[in-house]
Amino acid sequence: PVGKSSMTFAQSLTAAARLTEATLDRILSERSISGEAPEPQAGRLIAAMRHAVLGGGKRVRPLLVIESAALFGLPPQDAAHTAAALELVHCYSLAHDDLPAMDNDELRRGQPTVWKAYDEWTAILAGDGLLTLAFEVLGRAETHSDPAVRVALISALARASGAAGMVGGQALDLMADK
């Protein structure tokens, strides 16, 4: 399993990707998100969110989370939800970054980007949904039994992904292009 020092980097990356993909698939199930069968418009949004997240990507960020947890003696499964939350934020950023107003990319991982597969407004809302879902996942008891740890995870992700982190970096990138 992931987190074992006897594994090669490639083996660890593959194992982390599989664990993360399975966790993301469960998190992004329609019933998991809505708690019940969704309305048709929510079904389209969830499909766009799944398009943004599932079916590709190296999953390096989840590997780093899982391997960091292993340094503290935690098994991979105990870090799976935190790793998935980080990947949800990453995929949200890609869904927004691909939009015509930003990088205007039409392909991601060999597939149409969210805005090309659906439309721009759906890509924006899918990205927004992924971002908020990441914080919801971190707040769940299944992520960690200690509420203080969950709050610390939420706070750390908010700082890293906000104006002083990833979003600020994207703004600098776009300003440099003008």
Listing of model-derived features with the role each one plays in the protein:
Residues S12-A15, D25-L28, E39-K178:
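Mg2+-dependent prenyl diphosphate-binding active-site environment of isoprenoid biosynthetic enzymes
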Residues P1-S6:
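Short, Lys/Arg-enriched N-terminal segments with co-localized hydrophobic residues
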Residues S32-A37:
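Outer-membrane beta-barrel proteins and related beta-barrel translocases across Gram-negative bacteria
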Residues M7-A10, A17-T20, S29:
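Membrane topogenic helices and adjacent juxtamembrane segments
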